[in-house]
C-alpha cells in the first residue's frame, strides 16, 4: 500500500475516532468537554467526519492523492490550530465566526489546539518526507 496511503488511512481512523468522542459515555465532563478540554459540537463532528472521508478516499485512490490530502489537510489544520492558539477560536469549525476571539488561559489554548497543530504539522511533514513515493 505504501507509506503515504497508510498514513492517510491512519488519519481516517483517527478522525473518525475523534468524531465519535461525544457519543462514548464517560469521556465528556458535565460541561460537555471531551477529556475536560475539547468542547466538541456538531460543527467539529462534521469537520472530522468530512476530513476522515477525504483521508479515506485519498488513501484508497492513489499515492499521489494521499500526498495531496496530507499536504492540504496539514496546511488547513496547522493554520487552524495556530489561529486557535492566537485567538482562542479556529476557522475550520466556524469557531471564530460563532464565538469570536476568546480570552482563554494560554495553557488551555495550547492543550485545546495541540491536536490540530500536531496533526497538521505531521501531515505536511509526511507529504514532504515521502514525496518520492508519489512521483
Model features per residue range: what roles?
Residues 1-135:
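Membrane-interface extramembranous regions
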Amino acid at each position: 500500500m505504501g507509506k503515504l496511503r497508510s498514513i492517510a488511512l491512519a488519519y481516517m481512523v483517527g478522525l473518525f475516532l475523534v468524531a465519535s468522542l461525544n457519543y462514548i459515555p464517560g469521556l465528556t465532563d458535565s460541561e460537555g468537554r471531551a477529556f475536560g478540554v475539547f468542547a466538541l459540537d456538531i460543527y467539529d463532528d462534521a469537520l472530522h467526519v468530512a476530513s476522515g472521508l477525504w483521508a479515506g478516499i485519498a488513501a484508497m485512490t492513489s499515492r499521489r492523492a494521499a500526498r495531496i490530502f496530507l499536504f492540504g489537510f496539514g496546511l488547513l489544520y496547522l493554520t487552524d490550530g495556530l489561529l486557535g492558539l492566537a485567538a482562542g477560536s479556529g476557522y475550520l469549525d466556524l469557531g471564530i465566526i460563532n464565538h469570536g476571539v476568546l480570552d482563554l488561559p494560554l495553557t488551555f489554548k495550547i492543550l485545546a489546539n495541540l491536536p490540530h497543530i500536531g496533526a497538521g504539522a505531521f501531515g505536511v511533514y509526511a507529504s514532504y518526507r515521502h514525496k518520492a513515493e508519489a512521483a
